Amino acid sequence: MSTAKLVKTKSSDLLYTRNDLDEKVKLAAIKALNHQVVQFIDLSLITKQAHWNMRGANFIAVHEMLDGFRTAIIEHQDTFAERVVQLGGVALGTVQVVNDRTPLKSYPTNIHSVQEHLKALADRYGAVANDIRKAITEVEDEDTADMFTAASRDLDKFLWFIESNIE
């Protein structure tokens, strides 16, 4: 019984896998997936920053709501990273990579009110939701598109909840 070699072939940038998707489709999907891994890591950290540092009316409701959002975001980021590896790529999720590649605006660390945090979160959730929605139609790997669709549904719901709490 032979086992898969966990080395790159001379003609490919990918690790060996028996997944028979076209290499160009794999490479494009890996690029799109790693982009989302970066955004979702950043969004999860931003969410926790707000969760820890907000004060004011509706604090506990929003505080607890954000915990649920972060849990779902982390699950999606894990799914994306695992798909990268399934396709023969390397998942890129270090703090250094996220810092270098995130398209999200830097999150303000000098805000404190629930309302200020909700507005800052809405901007960033909206940016990621709009970006992943676009990625759904661009990626040619149907499994990756399905993963993006599931994440898009969650982000749209989370954005709705955030916006519904803005006064």
UniProtKB/Swiss-Prot annotation:
It is an enzyme of class 1 (oxidoreductase). InterPro entries: DPS_DNA-bd, DPS_DNA-bd_CS, Dps_gammaproteobac, Ferritin-like, Ferritin-like_SF, Ferritin_DPS_dom. Fe cation binds at residues 51, 78, 82. GO terms for cellular component: cytoplasm. Its main location: cytoplasm. One of its GO terms (biological process) is chromosome condensation. GO terms for molecular function: DNA binding; ferric iron binding; oxidoreductase activity, acting on metal ions. The keyword Cytoplasm applies. It catalyses: 2 Fe(2+) + H2O2 + 2 H(+) = 2 Fe(3+) + 2 H2O. It is found in: Cytoplasm. Keywords: Cytoplasm, DNA condensation, DNA-binding, Iron, Iron storage, Metal-binding, Oxidoreductase. Pfam families: Ferritin (PF00210). PROSITE patterns: DPS_1. Its EC number is 1.16.-.-. Belongs to the Dps family. Homododecamer. The 12 subunits form a hollow sphere into which the mineral iron core of up to 500 Fe(3+) can be deposited. NCBIfam families: PRK09448.1. During stationary phase, binds the chromosome non-specifically, forming a highly ordered and stable dps-DNA co-crystal within which chromosomal DNA is condensed and protected from diverse damages. It protects DNA from oxidative damage by sequestering intracellular Fe(2+) ion and storing it in the form of Fe(3+) oxyhydroxide mineral, which can be released after reduction. One hydrogen peroxide oxidizes two Fe(2+) ions, which prevents hydroxyl radical production by the Fenton reaction. PANTHER family: DNA PROTECTION DURING STARVATION PROTEIN, GENERAL STRESS PROTEIN 20U. This is DNA protection during starvation protein. It comes from Serratia marcescens. The gene is dps.
